[in-house]
Amino acid sequence: LLSGKRTTVTLDGNEAAAYVAHATNEVAAIYPITPSSPMGEWADQWTSEKRPNIWGAIPDVTEMQSEAGASGAYHGALQAGSLATTFTASQGLLLMIPNMYKIAGELNSTVMHVSARTLAAHALSIFGDHADVMAVRSTGWALLASASVQEIMDMALIAQAATLEGRVPILHFFDGFRTSHEVAKVEALSYDDMRSMIDDDLVKAHRDRALNPDNPFIRGTAQNPDTFFQSMESRNPYYFAMADTVQKAMDRFARVVGRKYHLFDYVGAPDAERVIVAMGSGAEVAQECVEHLVAQGEKVGLVKIRLYRPFRADLFLNALPA
């Protein structure tokens, strides 16, 4: 995997995400929670085995006392100019919300990987839905979905490239257990692929924004409403441009690796009268069904949603058959 040659490997979704995250970051602040635990465990194991990232450095992996602590360390690492990541789900993601607002507000480039899981209400459930991801829609993070193990590996790298350029943090998510623990045969990205996708000038720009006593500036102040309002508005152009930035990263990935993705992908009859809109693992099943029905002459189709936030309604409508 560490060579320049692409290989076919058998792994699950968690390992696929952790593989790219460990290779393209320098710090991982973790606290395991089902079903995301293996991502942190893989990262911890690879660091203990002295596996380098794509720059030849050994990433620092630190387990904190809770997800709240993990997100605080994660935020701090980003402020120090490190390329940092974390992995979580469900209640763990909820504990990260305060720092997620800070990370997005400061326009930090980063990718967090989430194996989406039900939130505890009248009872706890470790199984999968998107309740946790839906709870963080207002934090200012981009939300990017993967539907299969191959997509997890691909989207993890696409997200890393896009966030460095767009400066909007990305929450990359996939269905807990159904995809996080699905074992599949995939084409593993090589370190050369990752180096081709990551722009070192953008990495340097991220480092240059770090808090540094040799280049002091103020951040994290208390502001009155007039100033606060203007600062909030000044972030919007980054958010509005992020969808195009993600598509640009997808296009670059297609040139480097060969697999093509779009923010919304349509499969099915060009004259479909009935269309399913799906995000996550269900899209895989729906696609097989659609292809089977279309072969029998049915006018049906499927729109697969990849970038859920920012949601580009115009591109969604363009993806639908005319």
Locations of regions flagged by a protein language model:
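Thiamine diphosphate
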Residues: 1-135, 140, 157, 177, 251-322
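Short helix/loop capping segments that flank catalytic or ligand/cofactor-binding pockets
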Residues: 96, 122, 181-183, 285-287
